[in-house]
Amino acid sequence: MMSTATETMTDLDSIPPVMTLTQNAADKIASLIEEEGSDDLKLRVFVTGGGCSGFQYGFTFDENMNEGDTEVHQLGVSLLIDPMSYQYLVGAEIDYSEGLEGAQFVIKNPNATTTCGCGSSFSA
């Protein structure tokens, strides 16, 4: 007698991403990558000590994924997050805005307990 096993697959679309991008942010990232002329570039998002609230966000382009990095693919672009920054960025949203204060990436972070007035630093 032959038996069959039923396997339950998890719908990956139902798992919330580590970080989310707005369409504005994804479009700007794609535009910057196109300007650089390298399709291998990914946006590295990180947290460092500093700023008036204790931690600050940083952005840089990187072609290499380091050991322990988490890679997030959304809306046609890729983000890299190092293991230390991951705990501070999980669940955050990256937007891109242009206003009176200039153009900038803005992070809406549910892990931040306080943020400074300019939004570039936070405490957790």
From Swiss-Prot:
Binding site for iron-sulfur cluster: 52, 116, 118
Cofactor, how bound (note): Binds 1 iron-sulfur cluster per subunit.
Family: Belongs to the HesB/IscA family.
Gene name for this UniProt entry: erpA
Keyword Magnesium recorded: no
Quaternary context: Homodimer.
Function: Required for insertion of 4Fe-4S clusters for at least IspG.
A biological-process GO annotation: iron-sulfur cluster assembly
Domain of life from the UniProt record: Bacteria
Protein name: Iron-sulfur cluster insertion protein ErpA
InterPro entries: FeS_biogenesis (IPR000361), FeS_cluster_insertion (IPR016092), FeS_cluster_insertion_CS (IPR017870), FeS_cluster_insertion_RrpA (IPR023063), HesB-like_dom_sf (IPR035903)
